[in-house]
């Protein structure tokens, strides 16, 4: 699949802010520049102009500004040397005069392939012997190129292989037989490749989130295989264990896969493109995993019927002791878990959101280091763009110029605006005598390739670019709001740019977090009611599904960790995966109740039958997610960390909270219709429990 980590793809697709930005791009071109920092060089050094000229000749660069090129354009319009130096300081020349910058504007072909353009720029710098500490390189295209490099298949392959090794070892520990383990892992690899093929056919693109798709598909497939094998082990005493196991397994497995599908599909409510695609791709992975694992794992058991062995009696007795302790003290267990979840849940009110393109990169990245150094010593790459629309006004050029200058002064008054740039920046503050009416002279002085940067549609649209500080990403939103306030009485002014889009993305992410979680919760609850045909049991069973999410997100709220793209997706996905174990236990509980057992005995039997595979499946899934911590992308790391934490918490909720809640369900004792097919040792422990209840 082709890689696409363009920053704009992470911004809301449909919004008023996005529409305004698209209009800005149509009139002035994309707001994308590559900033080259040259330490310890003076503007008059021949090397500076040589580099600028070579960069201008690249097909991906439409023009490269150097300090001398900025200055010469101003000199042509009679700007004084003192004023030129003042205007270039903080834009192309550092305040301490120990660094200067080249501003390379991307051409349409450069926008098509940013990575190739950045490589061409690096070749020019290398040819000019500007390497290491002798040059700094940053800008949106540089960040995108680095994201594409890190998102390459070769980088994802590392933690995928690591995950494959870990999960293979864990599967062998659970199964205890190499042939069956190898067969399951081959099915898993097939499911991953089939998922990638379907996503590719659907037109999907690779980005750093999609790097987690292979691990997600692996986890789905292995979880289903673990449950199929467990059902088979529990049916070994029956005449046809495979047929019996499939008869009992298909419903909870299919419903679990459906819940996972719902959790992932709920992400498709997002207006952020990569999140939408990840939701679709993950949902495809859930379906493919169901077909492969439920369809092919029985074939392995048919091929090697003796590969799956029953649990040892010592291990079974340990499980029964634990189950007995849980269901015999349901009130204490429920109260303890409830208090812990409630205390952590208070942290939900402290959740906040944040999106910063630099957070996508490793903290030690040279791209991040260069950006921070350039912003500290030279200028920021973040900007808010003001579009001034004179509509059909026939006012003279100079009248418009003075009006733009007044607006620019207002915008520059904000404390977080570090520098402004417009057509007026190339003209003197006071026009020399004889120039006032010479519009033809101004048009000639500002060549079309320069005019297009700040003028459009003749002289209708004028642009003022405001560079803003980025020390605190939260300041972007406040700065945008303040600039809107400063220009509120000027209807001709419209504000746009990447910075306000990022602010809009933060709100979209936070809103999408709650929307995807609530929609998946409601749909899964409805699915519970329809499949179990019991509203009370369904609502009771949803409590342990939401508890791990409340627990983990409450903790990050207490810790003050902001919700980013990676964390935002975990809630609905984890909910769909946590339901996996819940379905198996609820169906086992319901079958036992229908057989005439009490709530406490049914909870005990359900925990004995499903507790071990629930724990194994969650452990395998957690280990798979932990491998994502090896990713170079911070959001992917946070996604893996959050998913692992929630899945591990689901073991605690599934093996303690759920059986305790089930044991508390009221209901009249029914006549025992039949005895469940359970190991004799289980009955030996169950009978005293039933007798104790009767007493």
Describe the residue ranges of each PLM region.
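Juxtamembrane segments of multi-pass membrane proteins
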Residues: 16, 33, 330-448
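Juxtamembrane extramembrane loops of integral membrane proteins
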Residues: 3-59, 65
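Acidic-histidine catalytic/liganding microenvironments
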Residues: 55-61, 272, 329, 378, ...
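Short amphipathic alpha-helices in soluble, non-transmembrane regions
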Residues: 48-56, 115-124, 400-411, 477-486
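A short beta-strand structural signal in non-transmembrane regions
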Residues: 34-39, 89-126, 135-136, 384-394, ...
